[in-house]
Swiss-Prot record:
The active site is at C164. The keyword Cell membrane does not apply. SUPFAM superfamilies: Thiolase-like. This is Stilbene synthase 1. Substrate binds at K55, F56, N57, R58, L267, G305, G306, P307. Homodimer. It comes from the Eukaryota. Induction: By stress, including UV light, ozone and pathogens such as B.cinerea. Strongly induced by ergosterol, a non-specific fungal elicitor. Positively regulated by jasmonate (JA) and methyl-jasmonate (MeJA). Induction by phytopathogen attack decreases with grape berry ripening.
Length: 392
């Protein structure tokens, strides 16, 4: 008879959790930042607020965003005007839209990841799904499992209302699942739609205006497993360690409150300083065990909360400009897609590395870091190890 220890050892994988495929998706509707102020004030029936529109236009100009993809269209706003009004009761219709579209958009990214992986979907043992909006029972994880035709025995984890740091949270969760369940293949999906936060402008809510200028819709997916079979699977990044911390006395720095009017967004002006002043401690704790203290020796996957956050982190750590290129590219092309962003950036980095004929998926470097920042103020830190782009 086997002992508990022998049984547990047999349950565990031998190697580190590894990302085996990545997929991303966006809605079809694209908005361009250069004329978004005109669009936004027109569809919210706010063109009479000329001074506020000028202020919003300046926010858009400084956002470093070229375009975003947004599910909500002008036709939908005409049909449901309360969504576009400032603080009008509208949660019911927002929920109707979100609970249908969040899993559908997640499916689009998941299908791309599954196609790249190339293995039967029946081999997916676990599903980890996160979104900032659309809480219901059964949840988006259940709907996605059905949309994809996953096995009814798939073990699901659903994370709601985590916010922008959750791209790190889902990787941390997937790492634990993959490494503690031999043979596990974990499908991770982040799907974000801004229908829950969209509303008209107000002089009394400038932090809400910042959110209207930054956030976009998108979904991303990865497949994670330990001990990959390299004859049929292609490793991309290893998940070496993962940690979460929150900054004391910063509970309201980034916040969202779900009310009859939807999800309201709140942001302290000093968020870039709070993050930049605390990020090096996270780096030190993560990389001291590896003997790494040169932050420019790492490849960087940082959540693009906004240009001010990226600038502050870059300056505080004396990072070379190229370190945040992949992050800035995703911000420019898609905006801030909350939890989905960091997986978009991972995808951009591996593609850029292959296109540039770099030696590894991490732009030729071995070690990297993935950061998620969000409500709490919470920081997720994931240590990554790249893999060679060419195998012998």
């Amino acid at each position: 008879m086997a002992s508990v220890e022998e049984f547990r050892n047999a349950q565990r994988a031998k190697g580190p959790a590894t990302i085996l495929a990545i997929g991303t998706a966006t809605p079809d509707h694209c908005v361009y930042q250069s004329d978004y102020a005109d669009y936004y004030f027109r569809v919210t029936k706010s063109e009479h607020m000329t001074e506020l529109k000028k202020k919003f236009n300046r926010i858009c100009d400084k956002s470093m965003i070229k375009k975003r993809y947004i599910h909500l269209t002008e036709e939908m706003l005409e049909e449901h005007p309360n969504i576009g009004a400032y603080m009008a009761p509208s949660l019911n219709i927002r929920q109707e839209i979100i609970t249908a579209e969040v899993p559908r958009l997640g499916r689009d990214a998941a299908l791309k990841a599954l196609k790249e992986w190339g293995q039967p979907k029946s081999k997916i043992t676990h599903l980890v799904f996160c979104t900032t909006s659309g809480v219901e029972m059964p949840g988006a994880d259940y709907k996605l499992a059905n949309l994809l035709g996953l096995e009814t025995s798939v073990r699901r984890v659903m994370l709601y209302h985590q916010g922008c740091y959750a791209g790190g949270t889902v990787l941390r969760t997937a790492k634990d699942l993959a490494e503690n369940n031999a043979g596990a293949r974990v499908l991770v999906v982040c799907s974000e739609i801004t229908v829950v936060t969209f509303r008209g402008p107000s002089e009394d809510a400038l932090d809400s205006l910042v959110g209207q200028a930054l956030f976009g819709d998108g979904s991303s997916a990865v497949i994670v497993g330990s001990d990959p079979d390299v004859s049929i699977e292609r490793p991309l990044f290893q998940l070496v360690s993962a940690a979460q911390t929150f900054i004391p006395n910063s509970a309201g720095a980034i916040a969202g409150n779900l009310r009859e009017v939807g999800l309201t967004f709140h942001l302290w002006p000093n968020v870039p300083t709070l993050i930049s002043e605390n990020i090096e401690k996270c780096l030190t704790q993560a990389f001291d065990p590896l003997g790494i203290s040169d932050w420019n020796s790492l490849f960087w996957i940082a959540h693009p909360g906004g240009p001010a956050i990226l600038d502050a982190v870059e300056a505080k750590l004396n990072l070379e400009k190229k370190k945040l290129e992949a992050t800035r590219h995703v911000l420019s092309e898609y905006g801030n897609m909350s939890s989905a962003c960091v997986l978009f950036i991972l995808d951009e980095m591996r593609k850029k590395s292959l296109k540039g004929e770099k030696a590894t998926t991490g732009e030729g470097l071995d070690w990297g870091v993935l950061f998620g920042f969000g409500p709490g103020l919470t920081i997720e830190t994931v240590v990554l190890h790249s893999v060679p782009t060419v195998t012998n």
